[in-house]
Amino acid sequence: MFKTEYHFEVKKRDWLLVVRLFGEIDHHGAVTLREDLDRLILKERPRRLVLDLSLIEFMDSAGLGLLMGRYRLMQDIGGVMVLSRPNQRIMKILRLSGMERFMEIEGVGAKGEQEDEAR
């Protein structure tokens, strides 16, 4: 696990890379997070990158830029990026930005709603 103003956990299986992000994605930590994610992506070269947003509490325009840049990087290396489990607040930001029209997003909903659906 890497730690700065944010932190994340990484799980890798074959050509799948799952990155679970915690906390906030804002202008304070976006540059360092971007650098760490880019290093990880270029080292592992996954075919599928899943960014688990279920524990993201806040995201601003720097966070949107971070997501867009990783989306493009994955396209450049021939892979795909999926956003997983954004809460309702983060999903609203993704909708307003237009990202939901071209990014694959799975498991939308508040954490409590997702747990209820799993039962």
What feature does the model see in each segment?
Residues 1-56, 72-119:
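STAS-like cytosolic regulatory interaction modules
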Residues 59:
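Conserved TIR/SEFIR loop-to-helix hotspot centered on a Trp-containing motif
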